[in-house]
C-alpha cells in the first residue's frame, strides 16, 4: 500500500468523534480515511476514495463497523450508471434498536438507476467529501455567486444505504463556499486548495503537529 504525502484531521463538533484522512491530491485524489463517532451508535468508518485527474469519482469503498455488526459498500461509475456492491455481517438493526433508534434497513440501494444523475459521492459525517465538488468545479477561486447544482450519491452512516441527493454549492469568495441540500444551508470555510477548515455544526479541522 503506497504512502500518502498529506494528512488531514477533523474533530467533530456535533458529537464525540473525529476523522483522519491520508491523501495524495497531485493528480486527482487518492484518499484513505478513518472516521469514528458515537452517534447514533459507536461506529468506526473506513474509506478509500479514488478520482480521475478532473476529480470525478472512479471508486469509493467504505466499511462501517460496530459491536456485533459490520457492513461494506463499493461504488463505481459504469457508463451511465453506478455499480453498487455491498456486504454485511452481524445485525446493525439490533444494535440500533438496543440504543433506542429505528432500524437502518439494508446497505446500498435496490434501485441503482436512481443514481444515474449523480456526479459526485458524499459520505455522511465526513467533511472531506465536500471538497470533491469544490475542487472539481474550482469553487475556491471562483467569482462570488458562482453557483452549481449537482446530484450526489450520498452514503449514509452507519447503514451504508445510498440515496441520490441534490446539493447546491455557491462560491462566496474569501475562502468560503455555501453548501445547501434540501432545507439545510451552511457556509463552509475552505483553504486555498478547497479542503474544509470549518463545517459549522459538524466538524473543524485540527492543525497538524
Set out the residue ranges of the language-model regions.
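C-terminal structured interaction module
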Residues: 177-209
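Short, solvent-exposed coil/turn segments at beta-strand boundaries
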Residues: 24-29, 50-57, 76-81, 172-175, ...
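Hydrophobic/aromatic-rich structural module bridging two neighboring secondary-structure elements via a short loop
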Residues: 40-97
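N-terminal ordered "arm"
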Residues: 2-53, 57
